[in-house]
Amino acid sequence: MRMFILDNSHGCDTPGKRSPVWEDGSYLQEWKYCRAIVKKIAQGLKEAGIPNHILVPEDHDIPLRTRVQRANKIAAQYGISQTLLISIHLNAAQQTNTASGWEVHTSPGETKSDEYARVFWETAKDLLGDKFPMRGDWEDGNPDRDSNFAIIRDTACPAILTENLFMDSEKDCRFLMSEEGEQTIVDIHVKSIVKLWLSKI
């Protein structure tokens, strides 16, 4: 693996991508949180000597087609099989406090991305422990969920999408907003990427 592309979810102008306002007035905005997380991941990888690229440095939303084009251009430069895109998100349910936990998604079918997703899954399971459910889909023998998201479907290189707990679950959200929670989400990604960098997967 020669390059890791970090995609930081939605932009500041995408409506509805935030937690409820909790009783103490606190809340979380997905675009701002994920950008902060991605910057910390990028710094951690830089310190480890691992090449990475932040796909969307802008705060505003960039169309999926443009994001895919950017990713494919980078993959063409470093080699499609030697590039991995990681799209980092926060999850949300239909109703407040009805879901909790961590997920990883890949495009439908059996692909190389499934192997990479399993590394992230195992790291998340180790770091989140018994605090939160690990929401896997084991129908095909892998824990990743097959999803038709454009950012993982249309990229030429392997790609995964992580859903890092539910921002509309108060328990999940308060953990995400804590120093421990923020560092845990960073560590899930940095440690997983380091494993892939050092492995022959």
Model features per residue range: what roles?
Residues 1-27:
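Short glycine-rich His-centered loop
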Residues 2-4, 31-201:
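Active-site-proximal helix/loop segments of hydrolytic enzymes
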